[in-house]
């Protein structure tokens, strides 16, 4: 269910702009997407886990806000990021 430190570090390395970058919107969205995907797998087994579902909805909302911010600041990076993460169809 939880994302391990190694998985999180790998996501940071894959999406960082420069070495040591952990706070850019791209990295934050990628980390949230990883956590959201792990929770979605969790809900396949634990359908009645409503407490965690509330946390999932908060993460989705936070990711949406970060994506809106990124789209308003740099639409090229936004399009590249959603393609890499496979968020839009």
From Swiss-Prot:
Organism: Nitrosomonas eutropha (strain DSM 101675 / C91 / Nm57)
Quaternary structure, from the entry: Part of the 30S ribosomal subunit. Forms a bridge to the 50S subunit in the 70S ribosome, contacting the 23S rRNA.
Classification via SUPFAM superfamilies: S15/NS1 RNA-binding domain (SSF47060)
Family: Belongs to the universal ribosomal protein uS15 family.
Cellular-component GO terms for this entry: cytosolic small ribosomal subunit
InterPro entries attached to this UniProt entry: Ribosomal_uS15, Ribosomal_uS15_bac-type, uS15_NS1_RNA-bd_sf
HAMAP family attached to this UniProt entry: Ribosomal_uS15_B
Name of the protein in question: Small ribosomal subunit protein uS15
Gene Ontology biological-process annotations: translation
Metal-binding is among the record's keywords: no
Pfam families the UniProt entry points to: Ribosomal_S15 (PF00312)
Protein purpose: One of the primary rRNA binding proteins, it binds directly to 16S rRNA where it helps nucleate assembly of the platform of the 30S subunit by binding and bridging several RNA helices of the 16S rRNA.
Coiled coil regions in record: none
Record PANTHER family: RIBOSOMAL PROTEIN S15, BACTERIAL AND ORGANELLAR, SMALL RIBOSOMAL SUBUNIT PROTEIN US15M
Keywords: Ribonucleoprotein, Ribosomal protein, RNA-binding, rRNA-binding
Molecular function, one GO term: rRNA binding
């Amino acid at each position: 269910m939880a994302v391990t430190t190694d998985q999180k570090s790998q996501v940071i390395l894959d999406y960082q702009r420069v070495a040591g970058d952990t706070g850019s919107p791209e990295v934050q969205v990628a980390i949230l997407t990883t956590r959201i995907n792990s929770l979605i797998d969790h809900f396949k087994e634990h359908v009645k886990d409503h407490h965690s579902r509330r946390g999932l909805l908060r993460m989705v909302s936070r990711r949406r806000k970060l994506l809106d911010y990124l789209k308003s600041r740099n639409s090229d990076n936004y399009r590249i990021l959603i393609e890499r993460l496979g968020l839009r169809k």
